[in-house]
Amino acid sequence: MARSHRKTNTFTIGTEMNIKPANTCDYDIVSLGEVMLRLDPGDRRIHTARSFDVWEGGGEYNVARGLRRCFNQRAAIVTGLVDNSVGRLVEDFMLQGGVDVNHVKWYPHDGLGRTVRNGLNFTERGFGARGALGCGDRGNTASSKLKPGDIDWEHIFGE
């Protein structure tokens, strides 16, 4: 439960964190969620496509990117990615979107994806009477491995 301290203009969550006043924060928005590599088959179906355009995507990230691009808000993402070529591609897309990636937790790649992976999202476009269709491949992803202590929340929100 947050409570206001009139003298310092900060907020305390429990007894563990003092939250900075908004005018002293590094970010206008910080999103926490999975950022995946999105594969788009164009006008084709996923099961018949032989090539895909690639993008980044994820609900929470999309909000941060949209606020950055449309309203010039200072945006950051907190997520987990595997330190391999796919993870670095997702990072590059996020940087192109203007979102701060300094709070990404990087996981080592085991060479096979047995211990941790980057999420994939295949998305067919909707047109005419056909609705959009998504097919996620999100098992054992880096962001699902985030646990308490992995992120320095005091650095992000605290004094």
Kindly give the residue locations of the regions a language model identified.
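A generic fold-level signal
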Residues: 24, 47, 58, 115-117
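Low-complexity, intrinsically disordered short segments enriched for Gly/Pro and polybasic residues
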Residues: 1-8, 112-118
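A general structural signal for well-ordered alpha-helical segments in protein cores
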Residues: 29, 60-64, 87, 119
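Gly/Ser/Thr-rich helix-start
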Residues: 34, 58-60, 81
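Alpha-helix C-terminal capping segments
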Residues: 55, 62-74, 96
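Positively charged, low-complexity intrinsically disordered leader regions
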Residues: 3-51
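Residues at secondary-structure transition points
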Residues: 51-58, 85
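Conserved N-terminal subdomain of the carbohydrate kinase-like
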Residues: 74-159
